[in-house]
């Protein structure tokens, strides 16, 4: 009898243990796997007391969201921290994550068939902290991830998530072994802003300070460290011209010995002169945001770019420090004295003609914010003659500083901020004779 009772008790204990294991396993949903990073391999995700736990987790088809113990089980009821609101709208977060994921994967093509993201969910780690910095990247060079605190994700649009998830997708290229992505650099920040701008076309309004800052610094070289968060406009131009997937292709093609401009030229077999033509076309369009995706919504920003000029006896020169650098640009408004009149200007380069080249031309803008463009010019000493459209209300001269003959990125990869001990970026000085 005792032996029979012992067997029954062992059976019941085994059943309880088995059910407990099944209960723990049921916390992990079906579908894509949840990757456990190396740094957490010793942690017990089944234990609700652990820093990261299946008991404080939410999943979608493509994401797993973990949150720290301090939030409690329900993010909508998270206790304040030092008097600060720590609540998170989890439903909105999950919804936005999937919306952004679909664009970055299916339209922008940052991941290709065979990606590790087909096996694993991307990871979002919510820190119970007042630290305002958010990060996007990957775990163990396996799967894209991002780390964020509540104060960055309490708005409905979740611009921060759109930006940081952009970094997660950029990192996934390295995780999947499909490209080197130059080994890093400011292009990552510019691209995340471009990705954000695609999923939220009102980014330039919501975070208008970026546009305001760029309007003070657009003379600086392309991908200057001061502008990488402010100016995704060249990337918008490239995607308009080459297709939405071109930026991901650029990341895959970029080698550690290159910079993005060199990679782009290589991808499309462009000479420096041809690339300079494209950069002028891009910047002349930027006067009215003449890019199909945002043209209508951005008419309100038409004609806002302006370069400080010194004007003396009909000779205009950029104010000290404002001459364009390599693939930076200037914008100068030319007075219209009579509608439909013929405008005559003379351009004179004032830099070393063996090294400096220019692209320049005119942009006429009507009251509705529509633009008409003159032919672009590249002469070092050139005369401009242009008959104004009858409906033109404003006229802008646009000039781009370009390398001559050969493009050499300035500094350690053109897209990195320059160190204090490095020589300054070259300026492309010029004179504009206004008649």
Question: Language-model features: where?
Answer:
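Bacterial Sec-dependent N-terminal signal peptides
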Residues: 1-25
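Acidic/His/Gly-enriched intrinsically disordered linker/tail segments
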Residues: 136-139, 155-160, 175-246, 251-290
């Amino acid at each position: 009898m005792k032996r029979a009772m012992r067997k029954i008790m062992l059976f019941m204990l085994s059943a309880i243990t088995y059910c407990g294991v099944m209960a723990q396993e049921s916390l992990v949903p079906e579908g894509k796997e949840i990757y456990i990073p190396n740094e957490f391999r010793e942690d017990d995700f089944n234990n609700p007391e652990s820093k990261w736990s299946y008991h404080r987790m939410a999943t979608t088809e493509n994401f797993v969201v973990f949150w720290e113990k301090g939030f409690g089980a329900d993010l909508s009821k998270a206790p304040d921290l030092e008097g600060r609101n720590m609540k998170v709208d989890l439903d909105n977060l999950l919804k936005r994550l999937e919306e952004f994921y679909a664009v970055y994967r299916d339209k922008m093509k940052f991941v290709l068939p065979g990606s590790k993201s087909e096996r694993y969910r991307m990871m979002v780690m919510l820190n119970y902290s007042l630290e305002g910095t958010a990060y996007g990247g990957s775990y163990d060079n396996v799967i894209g991830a991002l780390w964020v605190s509540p104060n960055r994700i309490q708005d409905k649009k979740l611009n921060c998530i759109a930006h940081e998830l952009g970094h997660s997708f950029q990192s996934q290229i390295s995780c999947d072994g499909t490209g080197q992505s130059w080994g890093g650099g400011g292009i990552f920040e510019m691209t995340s802003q471009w990705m954000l701008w695609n999923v939220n076309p009102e980014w330039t309004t919501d975070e208008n300070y970026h546009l305001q800052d760029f309007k003070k610094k657009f003379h600086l070289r392309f991908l200057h460290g001061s502008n990488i968060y402010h100016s995704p406009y060249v990337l918008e131009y490239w995607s308009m011209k080459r297709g939405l997937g071109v930026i991901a292709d650029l990341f895959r093609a970029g080698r550690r010995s290159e910079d993005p401009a060199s990679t782009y030229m290589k991808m499309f077999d462009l000479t420096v002169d041809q690339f300079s033509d494209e950069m002028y076309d891009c910047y002349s369009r930027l006067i009215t945001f003449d890019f199909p995706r945002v043209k209508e919504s951005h008419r309100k920003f038409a004609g806002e770019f302006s370069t400080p000029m010194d004007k003396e006896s009909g000779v205009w020169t950029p104010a000290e420090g404002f001459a364009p650098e390599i693939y930076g640009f200037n914008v100068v408004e030319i007075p219209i004295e009579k509608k439909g009149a013929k405008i005559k200007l003379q351009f004179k380069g004032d830099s070393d003609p063996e090294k400096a080249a220019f692209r320049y031309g005119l942009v006429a803008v009507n009251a509705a914010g529509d633009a008409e463009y003159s032919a672009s010019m590249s002469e070092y000493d050139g005369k401009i003659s242009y008959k104004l459209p009858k409906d033109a209300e404003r006229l802008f001269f646009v000039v781009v500083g370009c390398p001559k003959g050969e493009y050499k990125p300035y500094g350690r990869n053109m897209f990195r901020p320059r160190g204090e001990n490095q020589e300054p970026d070259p300026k492309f000085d010029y004179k504009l004779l206004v008649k």
